[in-house]
Amino acid sequence: MDAIDSVVDPLRDFAKDSIRLVKRCHKPDRKEFTKVAVRTAIGFVVMGFVGFFVKLIFIPINNIIVGAT
């Protein structure tokens, strides 16, 4: 019985903690959702520009390295 309890107790604790988390969570209102969506979009754009400029810098470097052989 002790072996079963050692498996079941962590699962029971996890389920209890999960239920408590879900009860504490709330749906964002329109203002909060808009704020999060705008910040996420800005992050995507910034990361896109970083990737674009890195690619823009490394294309000529790669051509120099490959063209030298």
Curated annotation (Swiss-Prot):
Ranges annotated as spanning the membrane: 33-61
Q: Which Gene Ontology molecular-function terms are recorded? A: protein transmembrane transporter activity
Show the Gene3D superfamilies listed in the entry. Preprotein translocase SecE subunit
Statement: the UniProt record of this protein carries the keyword Lipid metabolism:
no
A Gene Ontology cellular-component term: endoplasmic reticulum membrane
Superkingdom classification of source: Eukaryota
Q: Which PROSITE patterns match?
A: SECE_SEC61G
Identify residues that carry N-acetylmethionine: M1
State the InterPro entries in the record.
Answer: Prot_translocase_SecE_dom_sf, Translocase_Sec61-g, Translocase_SecE/Sec61-g
Q: Which NCBIfam families match?
A: secE_euk_arch
- What does this chain do? Necessary for protein translocation in the endoplasmic reticulum.
Protein name listed in UniProt = Protein transport protein Sec61 subunit gamma-1
